[in-house]
Amino acid sequence: RCLRLAALHIADPARLTPGEFAFWGDGLLNSEIAAEAAFALLSRIGAFPELFAAWIAPDAGWLRQYAALMAAARVPHPSPAWAVPAAAVVHGAAAASIPEAHLLAHGAVALFTALGTRNEENRQAVLRAAGSLGQLPAEACVHEELAWRLEV
């Protein structure tokens, strides 16, 4: 565990290419490592938009999705276009009743907050994406968190 965490801090973000996404994704063994990967490495790579697209996909698995959401919340210039797939991930997990749905909801909230506090255009994109969510428990979590984080 410690070696995996250390590797995330030692790796050079400038050298992480799309060809290595699978390698790093396979190393995400739990939510702690996924969150640390987002913080220490993934949010700093030049190919982050490509990583986000690959790891937010429905078949990417919840650990990669969580890492993508947490990293997206930390990139210097998050894209408002990421709000819709973030909401879709939460909805998919909530509808499938996977145990990690709330974790994905918290990842989406982190991204939504990073986006929604930048400017009004991003805020509106977040509100539209979050507004597409229903009232399943993980979806309700997103609504509740955004209500106070974005003062909705």
Segment roles from a protein language model:
Residues 1-152:
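Alpha-helical scaffold domains
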